A protein has these predicted regions:
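Glycosyltransferase donor-sugar binding loop
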Residues: 30-38, 217, 221-223, 244-256
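Short hydrophobic beta-strand element within catalytic cores of glycosyltransferases
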Residues: 310-314
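Aromatic "clamp/platform" in nucleotide-sugar-dependent glycosyltransferases that forms part
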Residues: 274, 293
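Short acidic/histidine- and often glycine-rich active-site loop of Leloir-type glycosyltransferases
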Residues: 303, 315-326, 330-331
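A conserved mid-protein helix/loop that constitutes part of the nucleotide-sugar donor-binding site
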Residues: 11-16, 212-235, 247
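Donor nucleotide-sugar binding/catalytic pocket of nucleotide-sugar-dependent glycosyltransferases
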Residues: 134-140, 144, 158-199
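A short, well-ordered alpha-helix in the C-terminal region of glycosyltransferases
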Residues: 237, 338, 345, 352-367, ...
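Conserved acidic donor-binding segment of nucleotide-sugar-dependent glycosyltransferases
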Residues: 325-326, 330-337, 345-350
Length: 379
């Protein structure tokens, strides 16, 4: 079960997971809560059953969904959805529980294993409304940076068979928040396929031309550090660095695009928006820059590692689960000055860039076997 199949890391992660599952042995179903912005469904295996429900979709679509519910005669659901939007201003946890309550039961099937891949209302819906012999929930981030649903999670985590997260740091944080559940909290990494990523990276795309080509993959928003990128770009431009910076991802905070224009950086940034295949842009870049404020275990960074790019990354709480400073990446402080300094240094230091590339080349890992952790829960 997943919320959307947009361009985010969780969406890409579940697509990768579904592609490596043993579908000759298991009958695999996917409940997709909302098809809005879906760009990854072409990459789903053709032999899985995808379930969608119009009422569930409209409950996830804000005021537009309320209008659709009214138009189709679902007056109580429309009122309930409005109430949920008001509740979310007070408590995301209870708004999430209310949304799960509103979501209709989509099937009477009993599953051997149900996996909630997104948490929050998906977790509550899975526990309360779906029949499964075993139930697993995922949390794809550092819980200390995203504790908004704690009041509800503490009631629902004891009801599932396993709680999975994507790195040891994330697991340790979950155990600190939910000590009574610590024995059923464990690691399952995001799955990234080197073969598939390398193949997709060879597709032809139009690219900007510059002596220094940078790329960042992620939503354009402060959480992903786009403001740090703008600050750094100002410094690079002031220092006479000739560069283009590709931003691949959904524009979430539009004021950041306005700021790019106001700062006179419109000819420096290339805002590409959402791309179903971002890998040619990563492959073409001289440096991959990841300025996020926090992450769980970034699948975008795993992909940049597979493509063996020199990487600059900020020192968010889980960064050491993926990187060692000056071994396989340059790790910098979370501000524009530090980011600019790291870019200038790495762009000028060919030997350092080559050392990162050599290390990454020697440590490419296909972790498709992670899927076997799920099979242990099926009788």
């Amino acid at each position: 079960m997943i919320g959307t199949l947009q361009s985010g890391g969780v969406s890409k992660s579940i697509v990768n997971l579904l592609n490596v599952m043993d579908r000759t042995t298991y009958d695999v179903h996917l409940l997709l809560l909302d098809r809005a912005g879906d760009i990854l469904s072409p990459y789903l295996p053709s032999d899985i059953t995808v379930h969608v429900n119009r009422e569930i979709e409209n409950l996830h679509r804000g005021l537009r969904g309320v209008r659709a519910l009214l138009f189709t005669g679902h007056l109580l659901l429309a009122f309930g959805s409005l109430l949920r939007m008001l509740m979310s201003k007070i408590s995301r946890a209870w708004a999430g529980r209310w949304l799960a309550y509103l979501m209709p039961r989509f099937t009477d099937l009993t599953f051997d294993l149900i996996i909630d891949y997104g948490g929050q209302q998906q977790l509550y819906y899975m526990v309360d409304k779906l029949d499964g012999k075993k139930k697993i929930t995922f949390f794809h981030n550092d819980y200390s940076k995203w504790p908004y649903y704690y009041a509800a999670d503490r009631l629902y985590y004891p009801k599932v068979d396993q709680i999975l997260s994507i790195s040891q740091t994330c697991v340790d944080v979950l155990k600190a928040y939910f000590p009574d559940c610590k024995d059923k909290i464990s690691v399952m990494q995001n799955i990234s396929s080197p073969v598939l990523i390398t193949k997709q990276a060879n597709e032809t795309v139009d690219l900007p031309i510059a002596p220094l080509l940078l790329v960042s993959l992620g939503h354009i928003m402060r959480r992903k550090g786009t403001d740090f990128s703008i600050d750094a770009a100002k410094i690079l431009q002031k220092n006479g660095v000739e560069f283009k910076w590709m931003l691949v991802g959904k524009v979430v905070e539009k004021d950041l695009i306005r700021r790019i224009e106001q700062e006179g950086l419109a000819d420096r940034f290339v805002v590409l928006g959402i791309r179903s295949n971002p890998y040619p842009y990563i492959k073409a870049a001289d440096i991959y820059v990841h300025p996020a404020r926090f992450e769980g275990k970034s699948i975008a960074l795993d992909e940049a590692k597979i493509l063996c790019k020199p990487i600059i990354v900020t020192n968010f709480s889980t960064v050491n689960d993926q990187f060692e400073d000056r071994v396989n990446a340059s790790i910098c402080e979370m501000n524009g000055d530090a980011l600019a300094d790291a870019i200038i240094e790495l762009a000028a230091n060919k030997e350092l860039r080559q050392s990162y590339v050599a290390y990454l080349n020697a440590h490419i890992v296909d972790n498709s076997s992670e899927v076997e952790k799920l099979y242990t829960f099926i009788d």
